[in-house]
A protein has these predicted regions:
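Two-metal-ion RNase H-like nuclease active-site motif
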Residues: 2-10
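A short, well-structured juxtamembrane/interface segment
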Residues: 64-78
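Short, well-ordered coil↔helix boundary/capping segments
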Residues: 63, 67, 91-94
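Short glycine/serine/proline-enriched coil/turn segments at secondary-structure junctions
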Residues: 11-15
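Metal-dependent phosphoesterase core characteristic of DEDDh/y 3'-5' exonuclease domains
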Residues: 2, 16-18, 25-56, 75-129
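Glycine-rich phosphate-binding "P-loop"
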Residues: 54-64
C-alpha cells in the first residue's frame, strides 16, 4: 500500500518539531493529527501565516500528544495494510521523513515493515519530465 503524507513542523536548523501530519492512502482513506506538544511560540513567520491559522480548533479530535500521533499513525497503517510492501511518498520529503520517524525515536525503532525512506514525489516528477 502506498501512503502519501505531508508534515508541518517548526525547525530552527538544529531541531525539527513536528506540528501536524496529514496522510492519505492510494485508495483515499485519510488521517490527520496535530501535536499538542509542539512549541508553536517558536514558529517562523511563514508557519505563523500559512499553517497556524489553518489548524483545527484545539477541541478537535485531531489534536493529541506525540505518543497519540504515533499510535494513530501505526493503527492507520495496520488498518490499511493490503499485504503488499508499504511505500511512503511525499513532496520534498527529507524533513518530513525525519519528523515522522522521530515519533518512534530513531529509525531503528520504526515498526516492522515501515520503510526507512520516503519516495520523493518531486524528484520522480522532475525525472519523468
Amino acid at each position: 500500500m502506498r501512503f502519501f503524507y505531508d508534515c508541518e513542523f517548526i525547525e530552527d536548523g538544529r531541531t525539527i518539531d513536528l506540528l501536524s501530519l496529514g496522510m492519505v492512502t492510494e485508495t483515499g482513506e485519510e488521517l490527520y493529527v496535530v501535536s499538542t506538544e509542539c512549541d508553536i511560540s517558536r514558529a517562523n513567520p511563514w508557519v505563523q501565516r500559512n499553517v497556524l491559522p489553518k489548524l483545527p480548533n484545539p477541541s478537535d479530535n485531531a489534536w493529541c500528544d506525540r505518543r497519540g500521533m504515533r499510535n494513530r499513525i501505526t493503527s492507520f497503517w495496520k488498518q490499511h495494510n493490503d499485504g503488499n510492501p508499504m511505500e511512503l511518498w511525499a513532496w520534498v520529503a527529507a524533513y518530513d521523513h525525519v519528523a515522522l520517524c522521530q515519533l518512534w525515536g530513531d529509525m531503528a525503532a520504526l515498526p516492522h515493515g515501515v520503510p526507512r525512506f520516503t519516495y520523493e514525489m518531486k524528484q520522480y516528477w522532475m525525472h519523468a519530465g
